[in-house]
A protein has these predicted regions:
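Low-complexity, Ser/Thr/Pro/Gly-enriched N-terminal "stalk/linker" regions
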Residues: 1-20, 45-89
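A conserved hydrophobic secondary-structure block that centers on an alpha-helix together
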Residues: 95-97, 103-158, 164-168
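Conserved small/polar residues in nucleotide/adenosyl-binding loops
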Residues: 262-269
Length: 269
């Protein structure tokens, strides 16, 4: 509501809370698909209205940034080149890190990925396109970013829910641009200069045969790659996924089914 201009205030909490709200929205839509509770429908409509109002015309939305801009008297919704003028919010980022996705710890791509998923599930459950339209705008913004950003900045992502998101958007809309983006995301991964085992980007994905690093980041990546394989049938991706799957279920999984958070320094052979 603050980002939408409904009320005034400051952003509170970690920068990935947008994504958590979109996951909540996806959950509400899933429940509504079963029980058709009109109160849930109204709840979703009210939430979506805020999302739509907070989203820029170019498709970008990240409430820490939007709120920071509003409080500084900057309205990037009206700027001709809003991607370059965006002011990074107060949570992370330095003075020289301006523009969308300048600091990956803002979790912007993570948030946008979950907006895509929420928009699709809401559309399936209700037949409405209000949130799906916002997701399309966000996906188009992401496509434009990856087509125009510097190579190093384009590789700058963690917790890559957008890998799954863009494939699901391709499935929902049939837009081939989204599938091309999903393939490109895998191609450029591991080419970043400061890649780490923790972020699964020290080496290209097609050279990875063991699970490594941060479990949340890893499982987002593996699920997204599986989606790309499902659409393209690329056998190399299946080889990587099969090997990683076997490594997890035989060596790095609790008896409860949980994937452990870290495995200490990853093997480098």
């Amino acid at each position: 509501e603050i980002a939408a201009g409904v009320c005034k205030g400051e952003h509170w909490g970690p920068p990935f809370h947008d994504g958590d709200m979109y996951k909540w929205m996806e959950g509400v839509a899933s429940v509504y698909a079963v029980n058709k509770d009109p109160e849930l429908d109204k709840l979703m409509d009210n939430f979506i209205a805020c999302v739509v109002k907070a989203q820029r015309a170019d498709g970008y939305i990240h409430t820490p940034v939007v709120i920071e801009e509003l409080n500084k008297g900057i309205d990037s919704h009206t700027l001709a080149d809003s991607q370059q003028q965006t002011v990074i919010g107060t949570k992370v980022g330095s003075e020289d890190e301006k523009g969308a996705f300048a600091n990956r710890l803002n979790f912007e791509t993570y948030n946008l990925g979950h907006l895509m998923m929420a928009g699709i599930v809401h559309h399936r459950a209700t037949g409405k396109t209000t949130l799906l339209d916002a997701a399309v705008k966000a996906t188009d913004f992401l496509c434009h970013f990856y087509e125009t950003a510097s190579a190093e900045l384009a590789r700058n992502a963690i917790c890559p829910s957008h890998y799954m998101g863009v494939v699901e958007m391709y499935r929902a809309t049939g837009n081939p641009r989204y599938l091309e983006l999903s393939k490109n995301l895998i191609d450029i991964r591991g080419m970043v200069e400061s890649g780490t085992d923790d972020n699964q980007d020290r080496i290209p994905f097609r050279d990875q045969y063991r699970a490594m690093g941060h479990a949340v980041r890893a499982n987002y990546l593996y699920a997204g790659v599986a989606d790309v394989y499902a659409e393209t049938g690329e056998q190399q991706l299946m080889k990587n996924l099969t090997s990683i799957w076997n490594d997890i279920v035989t060596r790095k999984m609790y008896v409860t089914g949980a994937c452990l958070l870290y495995t200490s320094p990853s093997p480098r052979d």
